[in-house]
Amino acid sequence: IRILYDDVVCWSLKKRFFKEMQDAGIAVRPFLEITFPQLASRINYRNHRKITVIDGKIGYIGGMNIADRYVEGTKWGTWRDTHLRIEGPAVRGLQLLFAVDWSYECKEVLSDSRFFPPVADKGKSGIQIAPGGPIGEWSNIAMLFLKAITNAKKNVYIQTPYFLPTESLVKALQTAALAKVDVRLMIPERSDSTVLRFASFSYITEMLRAGVKVYFYQPGILHSKTIIIDDELCSVG
């Protein structure tokens, strides 16, 4: 068992929390270890991935962290998120992402058949693992969303905890709505970040003006990052 965690997000956890796992034989490592987060020059270079791979054959990916709030909820209600279980060749993509991050942090290469066993096709749906990060000039995920929204014919449904779109994404959503595509946006009425909550609200008027339908999730905190286009393309992160 190997666990790679983000050191800034987990900075407040006691060292004994990780020591108990290490004593049980679990390899636990921080990603870009930080001694003082307030003074760190690399605080923005974090690992925000939520990946679980089992035996190289089963993968879980989405927005869920490992935290008590997913079981106990919050003072505002439930903590709503979306996570997927995948099987088949796409699991190799998840395993590769973890292996690259692990190699970067631990200088250990995970490449043999234990980690990448033969995997048969499963089902008929195509899955693409699209990693994002600060490497490279172009944001492949942002470009994928822009192209998909621009090409939408029937509907665009978006769930996000923080709606902070680029100007190009704003124009793409407005253009789609004005072209009579059913564009719907769901954001949380309450947020775990007051600053980001009000920043998200600042875009609502211009969305409504173009015909985008905006919904507020009220049962609790919405943390899901999901987009569905024409009932054919779905992205979860």
Spans of features found by a protein language model:
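Charged, low-complexity intrinsically disordered terminal segments
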Residues: 1-237
